[in-house]
Amino acid sequence: MLLVVLYHVWIGKVSGGVDVFLFISAFLLSLSFMRKINEGKALNLLAYWTHVFARLLPAAAVVIVLTLAASLTILPALYWNARAVDAQASLFYYQNWNLANGAVNYFAQGISDKSPFQHFWSLSIQGQSFLLWPILFAVAAFLVHRVRFKPVPAAVTVFGTVFMTSFAFSIWETKQISAYAYFDTRTRLWEFAIGTLLAAMTLKWKPHHVRTRVVMGWVGALGLVTCGAVLPVERIYRLNELSLATWRCGPCSPARW
């Protein structure tokens, strides 16, 4: 999120920080599930959902309530209903769809057009993915325990399919309705899928070649910070995922499969 703030406030460009946010969220979530599948442990989806949203919702609810209160105090009554709708959409993790269906253009908005809840769109996509991803891991676990796949090939099959489908749809919809595509969960799932695929690969990767790890880590970190400044990331498919993969793989190198 620091990338988003720095680029929006001081540089005036899109940083790709949201892509970083989604990628890392998926990577960390997936490490836990991949270890459970690899060790033959129960996934306990309900317990996971309860734990995650019990952690996320209280802080989000406080921000939403305070933002709504400030909006009703500061803004004219003309805007109150719209802000109440935004607050509800943010609380229940569908703010991205609320903005997409409201024909909001992220890149063409004036200050007066922006909602104080707009930043919840990326958190909404994260929340939706936190609901969907455990189900997909359950499918991967089924392939492992019933179809006799190994854990990594099972994950690659499930999440590779998600990646290819989402990426292809993202290209198509961005060409058709770029403003809608920006907020569409379906055009963002491939970013989550990359994080998961990398997490799966770490089960087969071991530390090796210290200098290579250090160089890859710094190259990836530099790419993360500078992609938004050098490239028109608001118009092309971001290289942030490549930079992230390089950064995350810095501590790893391939071992025998």
Features from the language model and the residues they span:
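Membrane-interface helix/loop caps of multi-pass membrane proteins
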Residues: 1-257
